[in-house]
């Protein structure tokens, strides 16, 4: 991929020791450690620019380097592969990212990455508060456990996004932007990610001022573990089933059936993520909420949250493990 994302004005290192690059990245971009192959003299390059609350970084270690991070805590990492490839391992899965692909790390995601010798990335560090604000500004609902994205994406999902990043880099390098302008750009990036990438964010649950909708939503919340019929909801709303569909499309942005399914999935995810919840098995949890086809349940869960329910449960158990002890060795 040949895009101008940060030029020599933002250059920090060229032909540098990888550990020097790593130390700088630890200070500004994200906590991690690196492991170098035996032999050879990798020469790293780094471009970095702070733009309001965003950190923009173009990085190459110049060698096959393994990067391990315990998590970003309060930030998201958007990593775009520009050259070479990068092996990602996480929650029992692995994938070779290549140019045109995008890796998105959530704040509590442990990262185990192995760069190819020619790997070059562009990284955007985005504070979680920016995504929270974008949810609020767009009247979307942020789950109690926080916003989570799937790890793997293709830039084709984000039409025009690479051009937006190029504009942000140009703005950061060539002008002294006002804080309000910087905040505006950060909000656009956050809204674009939430709108076009798979995440657990849904529309605002309630639409205040509509008693019929609020009455139906309250009934759903009180009966999530039961079989809820559309006829019963239409009766509660005092309208026909067709009008009920219109009501949900207007106030929830989806159908009644999808709304109920998503709320069940969100409750299951909250239970699986809660260290104080008594969860004996994912299957039992699915059956408890009326998902009798476990394979279809797992697929719906993954398409909604970007991971399998077993991955959510495993992450809760792994949360306090040392990342270098819990991750597989470098091949």
From Swiss-Prot:
**Which residues fall under the DNA-binding region feature?**
231-252, 282-305
Domain (HTH araC/xylS-type) spans: 214-315
Report the GO molecular function annotations.
DNA-binding transcription factor activity; sequence-specific DNA binding
SUPFAM superfamilies listed in its UniProt record: Homeodomain-like (SSF46689), Regulatory protein AraC (SSF51215)
What keywords is this UniProt entry annotated with? Activator, Aromatic hydrocarbons catabolism, Cytoplasm, DNA-binding, Plasmid, Transcription, Transcription regulation
Kindly give the InterPro entries that the UniProt entry links to this protein. AraC-bd_2, AraC_XylS_family_regulators, Homeodomain-like_sf, HTH-like, HTH_AraC, HTH_AraC-typ_CS
Gene3D superfamilies from the xrefs?
Homeodomain-like
Its BP terms in the Gene Ontology are:
catabolic process; positive regulation of metabolic process
Alphabetized SMART domains for the sequence: HTH_ARAC
Q: Where in the cell is it found?
A: Cytoplasm
What this chain does, per the record? Answer: Regulatory protein of the TOL plasmid xyl operons. XylS activates the xylXYZLTEGFJQKIH operon required for the degradation of toluene, m-xylene and p-xylene.
Tell me what this protein is called: XylDLEGF operon transcriptional activator 1
